[in-house]
């Protein structure tokens, strides 16, 4: 169970970011005082601040409760009553959640995520939204969720592609349908904006065209070999770092088992996106993030092509 000290730490970090963001928005963003019909626009503050809403969403991802309604009613409004004295009703809080999407995305990207350090690991994981038997009856994600097959079998939902550095920090992510291949160029166009150096992947990313495209952009894709492939020479340092892909596997484990990234109780697309952002944001506050063992890194800016 998350402690009050941890909740306070999360709130102070988010609140400080939100205050700086509000100052920048007031300087550079000019909102109209009225809408097109001539009526004045309301700008009244609510009982819960944006930082409090974001804190409640992030704290839910620490794995104590499996349903958000039980967490909010039993924990946020009772056990943490002293921390959130002006907590609104559950139905009202669900309506307020999409309001902090902009702030949550900026905090996740600017404060929670790390940066590329030249050593990157890439992986993807399935996010099912319902049982495969009920995929034809799902109305919430109709037209958005897709059928795809992964290492664990068929899945109806989405696929989360993400990359992390050797310190266990998530760099960026890309959400697609479950039927999108890991080697899809649209996914790597997003990743290439943040990456440089070497990217270590599993055998599912084997593609000559992908390797050449990334190599032209200064990114060296390193992956293992399949059993029916011809053996190729590989530097010993690449073999050592390729075996350290447990870093991103541990991140997958934390997001799925500790955080509530995967469940089939979403009632709207907006809440699904907010739950995804909250899970990725909460990961940066976990105390048991994986970290690679120190190894000797050769100081060379030259890419290796075989």
What are these regions (language model features)?
Residues 1-306:
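Short alpha-helical elements
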């Amino acid at each position: 169970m998350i402690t009050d000290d941890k909740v306070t730490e999360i709130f102070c970090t988010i609140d400080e970011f939100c205050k700086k963001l509000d100052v920048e928005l007031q300087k550079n963003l000019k909102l109209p005082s009225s809408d097109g019909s001539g009526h004045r626009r309301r700008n009244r503050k609510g009982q819960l601040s944006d930082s409090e809403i974001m804190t409640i969403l992030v704290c839910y991802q620490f794995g104590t409760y499996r349903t958000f309604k039980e967490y909010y009613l039993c924990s946020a409004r009772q056990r943490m009553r002293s921390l959130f004295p002006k907590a609104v009703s559950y139905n009202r809080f669900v309506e307020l959640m999409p309001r902090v999407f902009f702030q949550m995305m900026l905090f996740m990207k600017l404060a929670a995520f790390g940066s590329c350090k030249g050593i990157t690991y890439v992986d993807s994981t399935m996010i099912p939204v319902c049982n495969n038997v009920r995929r034809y009856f799902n109305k919430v994600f109709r037209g958005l969720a897709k059928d795809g097959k992964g290492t664990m079998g068929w899945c109806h939902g989405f696929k989360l592609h993400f990359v992390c550095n050797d310190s266990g920090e998530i760099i960026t992510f890309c959400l697609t349908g479950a039927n999108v291949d890991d080697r899809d160029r649209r996914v790597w166009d997003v990743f290439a904006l943040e990456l440089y150096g070497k990217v270590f992947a599993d055998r599912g990313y084997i593609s000559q065209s992908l390797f050449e495209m990334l190599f032209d952009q200064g990114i060296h894709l390193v992956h293992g070999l399949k059993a029916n492939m011809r053996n190729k020479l590989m530097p010993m340092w690449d073999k050592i770092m390729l075996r350290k892909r447990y870093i991103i596997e541990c991140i997958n484990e934390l997001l799925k088992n500790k955080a509530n990234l995967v469940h089939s109780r979403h009632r709207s697309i907006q809440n699904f996106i907010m739950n995804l952002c909250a899970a990725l944001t909460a990961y940066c506050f976990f105390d048991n993030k994986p970290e690679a063992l120190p190894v000797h890194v050769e100081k060379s800016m030259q890419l290796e092509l075989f």
